[in-house]
Regions:
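Multi-bladed beta-propeller domains
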Residues: 1-19, 42-60, 89-107, 212
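Structured, non-catalytic alpha/beta "coupling" segments that mediate domain-domain communication
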Residues: 67-95
Length: 215
């Protein structure tokens, strides 16, 4: 018999993995360089979007056919990977375990901004910093970007970045063309004859930060 399409392709998100737990399908997508998770019935009907703890990167959602719960890990720019328990029926996530750290992750914030590159292309960038930061044009910024080899740059934890943010710095992570945050066209737009786009994106990121008084 012919194959039946259960989860149609979504032009606005990249499907990264699919997991079967209990009587449900969990689809992990990447949208604007961070994770989204959707819960479906086995027939492909949407149950809900999983309410994640914030902007970050997710993994997990595995389990047995008769499971009533599942677990996933969630990491951000400002907190190390933590494990959450997810109730399949209610959609509620509860913290199950996380490493002990000598700082309060709630003291920091991450926002996502979009800016126009030289050719007008909208490029996303994550900005992480200590709460209470003043946009007065005087903050030091660590601007990091990678655009190549079809590799995405998604939220991840670094204690070094936390140390910088504790001293008043901003950690800026820009999703340059050349990665796969938006699929193959985004990848091709930053390779070979289009490589200049990668550098233009990075320069435009710095200009955005200056123009908006982050630094």
């Amino acid at each position: 018999s012919p194959a039946e399409k259960i989860l149609p392709e979504d032009p606005n998100m990249l499907l990264q993995s699919v997991h079967f737990v209990g009587d449900y399908i969990f689809a992990i997508y990447m949208k604007d360089a961070s994770s989204r998770v959707y819960q479906y019935t086995l027939d492909g009907d949407l149950v809900r979007e999983v309410a994640l703890p914030g902007i970050g990167t997710v993994a997990g959602f595995d389990g047995k056919d008769d499971a009533t719960e599942t677990f996933y890990t969630f990491s951000t720019f400002t907190a190390p990977p933590a494990v959450y328990r997810y109730d399949l029926a209610t959609g509620e996530s509860t913290l199950f375990a996380r490493p002990e750290v000598k700082f309060n992750p709630d003291d920091f914030v991450t926002e996502q901004v979009f800016f126009a590159s030289k050719d007008g292309t909208q490029v996303p960038m994550f900005l992480s910093y200590h709460k209470g930061l003043k946009k007065n044009g005087k903050n030091p910024v660590y601007l990091y970007g990678y655009g190549g080899f079809n590799a995405p740059l998604t939220p991840g934890f670094s204690p070094t970045n936390i140390a910088m943010m504790e001293q008043g710095a901003i950690y800026a992570s820009v999703n340059l063309r050349g990665g796969n945050e938006y699929g193959e066209e985004w990848h091709k737009a930053g390779m070979l004859a289009n490589k200049q786009n990668v550098f233009d994106d990075f320069i435009a990121a710095g200009e955005y930060l200056v123009r908006n008084k982050y630094t």
